[in-house]
């Protein structure tokens, strides 16, 4: 490593405070995208309420962060006409909107503080296992 390399800032280096605000949580409940026109029409709102309830006591992210999300979806989220399940972008939109009410509520620009995002979905065998696993780690950009 040259002296010039030593002076270059790390793009995603942890801040000294970052280790205090690492969030690793599985939000229990069935993830939903948007409002439903048939079936259990209250289910998306119930999911939003669960996200807010289960994340409201967590530390607030105020600066840049990295986020990883894994949606844990029950079998009925994978019907024959959608064998890969619901769209990730739609699942993520509702989740991030809800997190803007809790852990991202003090971040300038709301969820724009997320500088790196990894998202996936996987099928679980029951409603009891369903939810969303989130990891959030503040970084210096």
Protein language model regions, located:
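Acidic, proline/glycine-enriched N-terminal capping motif
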Residues: 2-141
């Amino acid at each position: 490593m040259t002296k010039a390399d030593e002076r270059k800032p790390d793009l995603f280096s942890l801040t000294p405070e970052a280790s205090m605000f690492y969030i690793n949580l599985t939000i229990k409940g069935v993830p939903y995208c948007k409002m439903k026109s048939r079936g259990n029409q209250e289910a998306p709102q119930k999911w939003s309420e669960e996200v807010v309830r289960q994340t409201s006591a967590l530390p607030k992210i105020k600066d840049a962060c990295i986020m990883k999300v894994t949606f844990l979806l029950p079998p009925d989220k994978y019907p024959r006409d959608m064998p890969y399940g619901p769209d990730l972008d739609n699942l993520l939109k509702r989740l991030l909107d809800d997190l803007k009410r809790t852990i991202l509520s003090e971040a300038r620009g709301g969820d724009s503080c997320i500088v790196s995002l990894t998202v996936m979905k996987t099928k679980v065998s029951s409603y009891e296992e369903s939810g969303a696993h989130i990891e959030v780690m503040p970084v210096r950009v």
